[in-house]
Amino acid sequence: MGGIFGVVSKKSCTLDVFFGVDYHSHLGTKRGGMAVYGPRGFSRAIHNIENTPFRTKFDGDLDELEGTSGIGCISDNEPQPLLIQSHLGSFAITTVGKINNQDDLIRSAYENGHIHFMEMSGGRINSTELVAALINQKASITEGLQYAQERIDGSMTILILTPEGIYAARDRMGRTPIVIG
């Protein structure tokens, strides 16, 4: 399981993201992360929260995470949000869900071109990185989000933070809800 949270504001959003992600702590027990966009560009922090609460781990990061838009997550799996640089520009991405056909998508990515993935412990590929790779196969983030949702067998809800704002995409079956407002 996991939970994701995002904020776009006219003022600093750091505390809103901090407390919004902390509120989701009951949804995951292994990793927590936050990414914000501000005057200095993207800033990110990811911590292991297996033995220490989210608030305790991230309290010291708040001064470095200054911006007016941000996303964060609690995850039982991979570390995230990830910072991506591609032909679509720079963005941060976080996901919650399960990709049932992950091995097939990875194999297809290797067969179709020049791509690599960072390997995690145990030889696993970060599913959030795989989603970013799918998105990056298209000409825009919106086209990429649609393409990723079409290719994924399973459930994947996604937040993407760009310098312009946040893209939110609920999984196509509605298993993992997303609230905007």
Regions found by a protein language model. Give the residues of each.
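Conserved short alpha-helical segments that host acidic/polar catalytic motifs at enzyme active sites
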Residues: 1-181
